[in-house]
């Protein structure tokens, strides 16, 4: 049985050893991130110009955002499919990152991956959402009953958030091994959640937060200072848009590697709990 330290160390070494192969996913994420960042910068700047036709700007950016959304969805599906391969090969005991071949298979597995996660969100949040809606309507009948239902729904929502956070990570690995229905083996997956696992995912979350903050914060600070003067100076406008694009690109690039680090560590834990050698 491995230790938390061994899972984290192995995941770090996995990224270092396979950095070049994984770079494909990082670059795909960065390209979509840069496009989103540049678009966001344009909106920030030009929505403040009173002499522009606001509706024309909104329609133009909606079309552009639609294109970015479709591209982003395709890239997310491909990366999701690749993450499934990483989890599966990790459980199988391989230390070499899988190839980026058979894009159709990556898309297929990635789409199922996204659908599975969406369904899990619906399942976990259905009850608190229904209770909250009933609570809102009950306020018109009895404020006490309405308030009670709303409070209960919020408490259940908090429990659902924590439960889904812990459950979904193991469910993803289970899907990579058993197929789509692996998402919904609730009894089996909840049995795998123990103190060691909870500590592991908390440490992973802290590591991801700190690294993301270190990477993005300096550019965001520069971004804030430049944004106030960007409209008045064409050079500053270009710098502002560039920084926004770089910030988003760098953030999504790093997020990809952090994602690989996370799923690798959880997959190693899953492998140990299943007793797979």
Swiss-Prot record:
Keywords carried by this UniProt record: Cell membrane, Membrane, Transmembrane, Transmembrane helix
Cysteine disulfide links: none
UniProt subcellular location: Cell membrane
Sections of the chain in a coiled coil: none
Pfam families referenced in this protein's UniProt entry, alphabetically: DUF4013 (PF13197)
Location, primary (coarse class): membrane
One GO CC term, this protein: plasma membrane
Membrane topology listed for this record: Multi-pass membrane protein
Transmembrane residue ranges: 23-43, 61-81, 117-137, 144-164, 197-217, 221-241, 243-263
Domain of life, source organism: Archaea
Family statement: To M.jannaschii MJ1189.
Protein name, as recorded: Uncharacterized protein MJ0233
Organism: Methanocaldococcus jannaschii (strain ATCC 43067 / DSM 2661 / JAL-1 / JCM 10045 / NBRC 100440) (Methanococcus jannaschii)
């Amino acid at each position: 049985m491995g230790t938390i330290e061994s899972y984290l160390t192995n995941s770090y070494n996995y990224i270092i050893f396979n950095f070049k192969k994984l770079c494909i996913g990082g670059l795909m994420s960065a390209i979509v991130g840069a496009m989103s960042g540049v678009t966001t910068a344009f909106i920030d700047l030009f929505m403040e110009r009173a002499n522009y036709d606001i509706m024309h700007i909104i329609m133009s950016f909606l079309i552009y955002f639609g294109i970015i959304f479709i591209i982003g969805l395709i890239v997310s599906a491909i990366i999701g499919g690749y993450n499934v391969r990483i989890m599966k090969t990790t459980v199988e005991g391989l230390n070499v990152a899988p190839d980026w071949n058979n894009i159709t298979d990556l898309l297929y597995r990635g789409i199922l991956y996204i659908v599975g996660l969406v369904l899990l969100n619906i399942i976990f949040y259905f009850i608190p959402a229904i209770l909250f809606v009933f609570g809102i309507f009950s306020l018109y009948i009895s404020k006490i009953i309405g308030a009670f239902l709303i409070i209960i729904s919020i408490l259940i929502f908090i429990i659902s958030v924590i439960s889904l956070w812990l459950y979904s990570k193991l469910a993803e690995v289970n899907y990579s091994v058993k197929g789509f229905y692996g998402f919904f083996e609730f009894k089996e997956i909840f049995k795998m959640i123990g103190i060691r696992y909870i500590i592991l995912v908390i440490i992973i979350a802290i590591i991801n937060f700190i690294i993301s903050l270190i990477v993005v914060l300096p550019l965001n600070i520069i971004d804030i200072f430049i944004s106030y003067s960007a409209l008045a100076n064409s050079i500053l406008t270009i710098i502002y848009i560039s920084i926004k694009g770089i910030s988003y690109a760098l953030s999504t690039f790093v997020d990809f590697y952090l994602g690989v680090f996370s799923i690798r560590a959880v997959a190693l834990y899953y492998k140990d709990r299943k007793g797979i050698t």
